[in-house]
A protein has these predicted regions:
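Cell-envelope and extracellular/periplasmic
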Residues: 19-249
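Positively charged n-region of N-terminal signal peptides that target proteins for export
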Residues: 1-4
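Hydrophobic h-region of N-terminal signal peptides that target proteins for export
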Residues: 9-18
Length: 249
């Protein structure tokens, strides 16, 4: 009887400790470079090292080649307001559905069933290539700011941190590409809970004897480093520390 009682007490104590352990949620979303990042190889090992005994969990909603309008139903109205013509709007939108916003809410709800209270929520965003190539950059700043605001509202986390992966240097010959990089930095700098990740060193590779800056990052090391940087910048925001200003923590 004493053995059973002792075992019960130990199990109860373990459950209490587990319940008291802070849980930090990261939302990983975006297009191909976020899709290509396996959180198990770079992000989670780094997060576990940083947070120690605290628990880190994540949800991931990402798919290659997707413009921001796949996350935001208000994008069409924003695009018109910013002067995009109907032809360009149709070319970017392609009558596609807003298919990636609700899955974030659904996965968040599922996570809440396992962890009723998150110590922090951090939104990691790696997207923008499709909008830059399609000429959608005039609407991008307002669209991304609204997406962030909606997530903070719908997740009931006005304290949600954001970490934006700035577009790489792959397409800098295009004016729209450079404009997109600038927009992403403006959003980070204007948000008191914002940080950014630099990826300009993750896509350099040799082709036909020349070094090129590719759209997609080097495998596996580029995506491992990407995950580590997201974890480090998120950790700094969560702990009230100053994120790396150069985006390369």
């Amino acid at each position: 009887m004493k053995t059973i009682t002792l075992l019960t007490l130990l199990l109860t104590a373990s459950a209490v400790v587990a319940a008291d352990k802070p849980v930090h949620l990261f939302i990983l979303s975006g297009q191909s470079n976020m899709q290509g990042m396996d959180p198990r190889t770079g992000f989670m090992p780094e997060a576990k090292k940083l947070f120690g005994d605290e628990e880190v969990v994540y949800i991931k909603v990402a798919k290659g080649g997707q413009p921001i309008c796949r996350w935001l139903e208000e994008w069409g109205a924003i695009a018109k307001e910013k002067g995009l013509d109907e032809k360009r709007i149709k070319r970017i939108h392609k009558d596609g559905k807003v298919e990636f916003y609700q899955p974030i809410l659904d996965q968040y709800k599922e996570m809440l069933e396992k962890h009723p209270k998150f110590a922090s929520v951090t939104f990691c965003w790696m997207q923008g290539e499709r909008d830059a190539n399609g000429g959608g950059q005039p609407a991008y700043k307002d669209a991304l700011k609204l997406l962030i605001a909606k997530l903070r509202r719908d997740l009931e986390r006005p304290d949600m941190n954001i970490v934006i992966g700035r577009l790489s240097d792959a397409g800098q010959k295009k004016e729209s590409w450079g404009a997109m990089r600038k927009i992403q930095m403006e959003i980070v700098n204007e948000d008191p809970r914002g940080a950014w990740v630099d990826v300009d060193d993750l896509n350099n590779r040799e082709k036909d004897g020349k070094v090129i800056n590719a759209v997609h990052y080097n495998r596996p090391e580029g995506y491992i480093t990407l995950g580590q940087r997201f974890a480090r910048q998120g950790y700094a925001l969560i702990k009230g520390e100053k994120p790396a200003e150069d985006g390369r923590p």
